[in-house]
Regions:
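RNA-binding accessory domains that recognize and position tRNA/RNA substrates
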Residues: 1-207, 227, 235, 340, ...
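Residue-level detector of beta-strand face positions
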Residues: 5, 279-281, 311, 322
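Proline-centered loop/turn at the N-terminus of a beta-strand
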Residues: 116, 178, 247-249, 265, ...
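Active-site-proximal beta-strand elements of phosphoester/diester hydrolases
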Residues: 178-183, 291-292, 331-335
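Short acidic/histidine-rich motifs immediately flanking catalytic phosphotransfer sites
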Residues: 213-218
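Cysteine-nucleophile active-site neighborhood
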Residues: 222-298, 342-356
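Catalytic beta-strand/loop cores that center a nucleophilic Ser/Cys/Thr
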Residues: 287-327
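A glycine-centered loop/beta-turn motif at secondary-structure junctions
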Residues: 322-358
């Protein structure tokens, strides 16, 4: 293993060893508190442009499952068809894995996909730095190549345009009610969750004008980066809402885009919510749910138009976790009800959406 150094934008340095693809890289450094689910996290398009730090110390223990495509045409064990994180940062990488479904080690997978991975990092201290000072840009440099310095931007980059489909894709064609899914970086399990409820899914590019299509409901998917870079998508949503009261549901980035269409402003969280243990409360009730989350931006609910209200709030910091219209079947969640990985406490969100189609 080659010696590497993680250099944060404030000058803080962490020393470790390379166990993935040997190439310097730069990106926004974030942390995830989940204890498992690294194959799903690495293939989540919402992590595009980021150096992902896993706070759980042991990573790689159960290897990597095979990449297979199910009958529905979506990946069986991954959330997309490739790794989207720019690099993986762990405390203790485990080379010897053990799992009945594993076909290769995490290191082999990273190398095959040309994604750097570093181990031996004090991820506890790194997380404390990010928690106190906020997420920041970072660079992974190889000690024997001090002049090979990568450059990358995160702010002002439209990552949604990079990860969204470029063509219309249909799943479960002819099955029943038709749902247009706006792909901002959709996870495979969102598509699977809709298909399992007997609907046809029409996946369209994030910038596509679907208002003239024949469909029964609109689903706004998750995605990476700053939602303010997706104003073209917001305008199409506004156009759709002015034309019809067809059901609308959104997840993560979808919550932010629908909120922008409802007049709300978006702000960046200090260090985001990334993990499997985020508690949220349904507004107007005493019901609390444990949720899987992955976002760095939030909705300022106080700026919503008068016809809208909060649906969920985060129990840790009070930030918005979903909105709903007071009359029309339009609602969202900032968290991921499809999980994968993570708790499925809020899986009912898909049931609620499909019920509104009938």
């Amino acid at each position: 293993m080659r010696n590497v150094t993680l250099v944060l934008s404030d000058g803080t340095k962490f020393h470790g060893k390379s166990f993935g693809y040997d190439a310097p890289v730069a990106g926004e450094v974030v942390f995830n508190t989940a204890m498992m689910g690294y194959p799903e996290s690495l293939t989540d398009p919402s992590y595009a442009g980021q150096l992902l730090t896993m706070t759980f110390p042991l990573v790689g223990n159960y290897g990597v499952p095979p990449f297979t495509i199910g009958e529905s045409g979506i990946p069986t064990f991954m959330e997309s068809d490739k790794i989207y994180v720019s690099a993986l940062i762990v405390s203790d990488y485990t080379e010897e894995y053990s799992h009945w479904n594993a076909v290769e080690s995490l290191a082999e997978w990273l190398k095959r996909e040309h994604v750097p991975g570093i181990t031996g990092i004090d991820t506890r201290e790194l997380t404390k730095v990010l928690r106190e000072h906020g997420v920041m840009m970072g660079k992974i440099l190889f000690d024997d190549e001090p002049d090979n310095i990568p450059e990358a931007d995160y702010e002002g980059v439209n990552f949604v345009d990079r990860v969204s489909t470029k063509e219309i894709i249909r799943y479960n064609e002819g099955a029943g009610k038709k749902v247009v899914l706006v792909d901002c970086g959709v996870k495979a399990n969102i598509i699977r969750s809709l298909i399992n409820r007997g609907v046809e899914v029409i996946r369209v590019p994030w910038i596509y004008d679907y208002t003239g299509m024949d469909y029964d409901g609109l689903f706004l998917a998750n995605g990476p980066g700053d939602p303010d870079m997706c104003n073209d998508a917001v305008e199409v949503i506004r156009k759709q809402m002015s034309m019809s009261k067809k059901p609308i549901c959104g997840i993560c980035m979808g919550n932010q885009l629908l909120s922008k269409a409802a007049g709300a402003k978006i702000y960046k969280l200090k260090y985001g919510h990334r993990g499997h243990n985020q508690p949220v409360r349904m507004v107007g009730t005493d019901k609390c749910y444990i949720t899987s989350q992955n976002h760095g931006y939030a909705v300022d609910a106080s700026t919503l138009d008068k016809d809208w209200q909060e649906l969920f709030v985060n129990m840790n910091d009070g930030s918005n976790e979903g909105i709903c219209h007071k009359e029309n079947p339009w609602f969202t969640s900032q968290f991921h009800p499809e999980a994968c990985s993570g708790p499925v406490d809020t899986y009912f969100m898909f049931d609620k959406f499909v019920e509104t189609l009938k």
